[in-house]
Amino acid sequence: MIKLLGVFFVPIIPFSFVVDYVFENCKSCRNYFFPVLVLLGVLVGALGVGKAGTLLILLAVLTSIAYTYRLFRVQNYEEWLLTYYIAVASLSWLHPEKMLFFISAFAIPLTVIHFLILHMKNQGAKPEVEEFKGIATYLPVLGTLAFVALVSSLVIAPAYAFFTLYGVFKGNLILTPILLIEWLVWLWVGFKMFSPVFFEEKAEAPKYEDLDFSEVFPLTFLLFLGLLLPVL
């Protein structure tokens, strides 16, 4: 039963298509769809799914490749979050015993990014590159948290995840280059999507407010947990 739920909450093809459909069509639940999905994924990892068979492993690798390729076509930050999460989380099926730690490494910083996006949406911003251009300059607290979360999700989390999977792809001449190429794509697309946030400016200052303490504290705490996870 847990494994059946797992293929939806730690999505792999074809079950990931259901996740895509709900995400695209449930506009009323869009703001909290992603954190609920990753929370359920963490729960599945905590409960344990047992060993993954050959078919499940093949589907997991196929899912990761397909969603990594899809990253080239994402149009906004919400699409990037979900697509990137599925691309990386699906690989946790290669080592289900470590699924909890694997997923958590990505879920924590990506959830922080989600709530930073939500903070902007609540002020009327659309989750698009043009809307977020230069935001880090005018909203330094949000910009700092976004930068740390981005580095954590694109650099620290994959490094930790690959260390977790080392025993799986060690000596595998097919899987190893696939994972390395995927990581390069994740880095390139991620920094390309977010570089306007940090390195470009709008013609006039945007009329958005920065985070207050009630928002900064829990997000900073989450980031601290994410950075601490690799040494646990």
UniProtKB/Swiss-Prot annotation:
One of its GO terms (cellular component) is plasma membrane. Its main location: membrane. It is a multi-pass membrane protein. The keyword Membrane applies. Keywords: Cell membrane, Membrane, Transmembrane, Transmembrane helix. The chain crosses the membrane at residues 4-24, 42-62, 100-120, 145-165, 171-191. It is found in: Cell membrane. The keyword Metal-binding does not apply. This is Uncharacterized protein aq_836. It comes from Aquifex aeolicus (strain VF5).
